[in-house]
Amino acid sequence: MAAPPGEAPLTAATNIEPFYVLHKGGAAASSSSSSAPSLPSSGRARRRIDVSGLASPNPKPGKRSRDDDAAEDDDDDELYERLRLDAFHRVWSKIQSTINEVLRGISLKLFDQVLRWVQESFSAVRSIARPSAAEVRQPYPLLTDVICRKIPTAFVLTKNAEFVDDITTFRDLAEYLESNGCHLAKLSATELSEKNGVGCCFRSLLRQLLSDVPDVADIFALASWYSAAENYDQPIVVVIDDLEQCSGDVLGELVMMLSEWVIKIPIFFVMGIATTLDAPRKLLSSEDLQRLEPCKLTLGSPSDRMNALVEAILVKPCAGFCISHEVAVFLRNYFFKHDGTITSFISALKLACSKHFSVEPLSFLCMGMLEEDRENFWHDKFNALPQELRKYASGLPSCTREKDSTKSGDNMVDGLSELMNIQKDWSSVLLCLYEAGKHGKVQLLDIFCEAVNPDLHTQKAPNLPNEKSGTSRRFIDQVMDTIRYLPVETLFCLLEVWSIHLNGMDKITNKVKELQSTTISTDSVRITKDKWPRRSTNSTGNSTVALNDKVAMLLDDVTRKFLVSVECLPFHEIVCFKNVSILQSALIGNPRRMVQLDLVKSHKHLKCSCCRKNGIAVLASMHDTSIMCNLAQEYGDVINLHDWYISFDGIINSVHSKIKRKPHTSPSKKKSKPVAAESEAMIQARFCRAVTELQITGLLRMPSKRRPDLVQRIAFGL
């Protein structure tokens, strides 16, 4: 970070330092200060832990120097930052493993269908003819019948907006088929392009099957390999994950070539289709389509996968990390308006998790949610906190009503334990809402966004079945309306599922059982009405309507009492990410402002010892581009190059002027070598390079021919 010394000559050709923009969410602290209590002015208490074991056993507070305190604070900073980083890795690892299990569980049904289809197709091909190994090795097809030249092909409709969500699915499908006794080969859209041709495509297929690919890649090499005893009784499955992006001519030529050998070499296709099942008809010719024997399979819709993911990672407390109402609404809008992919939603959630652990000083306590003895874990961690962080914990906005600070440690542990218990009941009630909303095609993500709204929790609100609560309960009210029109059989099944979700909530479970018994009696009355229609009355219909209203009123009452948002609970800031502005700027992006902010506050990211002591002042030890960006803040939309250079020259030469004015030190101290002042040509070269880097990053527009002495600023707003 220091300016290059004068004893080594510098030129732009020999010393071009790389230009780094290190962004670590520095703007997060300032933007989140409005929602969290401010820490001591040193700014270091938010990353301190108990390091009493590192201190001297007999400290003398009267003789400790400031340098020793600063060194100890630096060590505390690194230890505490490492603790939060470890907590993030552990929490996100749990979330990621849950995501993988959910997606694989959804895909297993499709995998079983594909495997069953492969086995049936292989049996059908073998029933036509079973050539011997010698016949397979013969360099010509075995049969010429048209019926025997059709390749069994499974078209898998994924319904995804982007192919990025299909990558994991087809990768797992290939592993699943290979583990169940199939020879596997994967062909990408790049290999099936006009640029590569069918020869490159077939060579790629051979490389995945044969251990030694001959120089001349032809179908006879594949036939010779398949005639071996260890390969003969297993089908060959070729997976093409993105059919729409392939070249129709290349794929058609491959189909025509392999179809001639389908009896000798049982090769089957599995092709992924993202749009509609008419895609093969648009891509391949009629002659090519006649060589395929299609089978249509469908993967679960993106909405089903999204509902399963939201239930596993946001509704159920799987890792101790949650998001606020504003963040949930932003993620939902980002999913629907950006590209509609599960991958983008997961990436945004991971970014929110990382921002939470980088901003919140006490976020490392989230790990306690994963511990079996979580209360002892929280007690130990709280006892290790310094006094500043204890005050910070008791001063959280959600805890400002707590008057007693003498037992703040117990209050925090009890508060986090109560938060977990309330969240468990919250998730149970939310799942009951979703089970009822399925009959009205209500998505779980929409209900979730309403359930995390802190304004929704009105425990003493009037419980009127026909009264709407406003737009904040739009989807929840839609669920209530759906319940009122459900038939008795569906209502009984719904109550059965509710009793499973509400396990552990005894009072609510008893009410559900009462409604179940009422449902059974109502159903028996309906059967009696069907047997003796003349003796029945209209009271049966009225009782059914009353029963539906009772179920809706029960769910509405449970919702108002137990659907408590996490933002209404004490200490929720520790586990809940609320700063949507950070997430919005990171995902939607404002790159010029972020680059400018990183340059102006470079010392916060680089953490060098020379610039850290005076973080506000512009020092010569800073990078030239950072110095120039700081000086540019003093100008308007245009900057005079001459004035800018004079300011830059003054900063650079301030080091040498301080050395000249430095008083003589004691003779006992070792004399340092004098630092020679830099030449004006070198300062001009450094100035020009810094201006060029600011132009490359998009912060400046270079001088025009009319005003060559002025440059124009592009980025503002700091």
Swiss-Prot record:
Belongs to the ORC3 family. Residues 26-43 have a biased composition (Low complexity). It is found in: Nucleus. Keywords: DNA replication, DNA-binding, Nucleus. Expressed at low levels in the shoot apical meristem (SAM), leaves, ears and roots (including root tips). Component of the origin recognition complex (ORC) that binds origins of replication. DNA-binding is ATP-dependent. The specific DNA sequences that define origins of replication have not been identified yet. Component of the origin recognition complex (ORC) composed of at least ORC1, ORC2, ORC3, ORC4, ORC5 and ORC6. ORC is regulated in a cell-cycle and development dependent manner. It is sequentially assembled at the exit from anaphase of mitosis and disassembled as cells enter S phase. It comes from Oryza sativa subsp. japonica (Rice). It holds the Pfam family ORC3_N. One of its GO terms (biological process) is DNA replication initiation. A motif (Nuclear localization signal) lies at residues 659-666. Induction: Reduced expression upon sucrose depletion-mediated cell proliferation arrest, and accumulates after sucrose treatment. Residues 26-75 are annotated as: Disordered. One of its GO terms (molecular function) is DNA replication origin binding. GO terms for cellular component: DNA replication preinitiation complex; nuclear origin of replication recognition complex; nuclear pre-replicative complex. This is Origin of replication complex subunit 3.
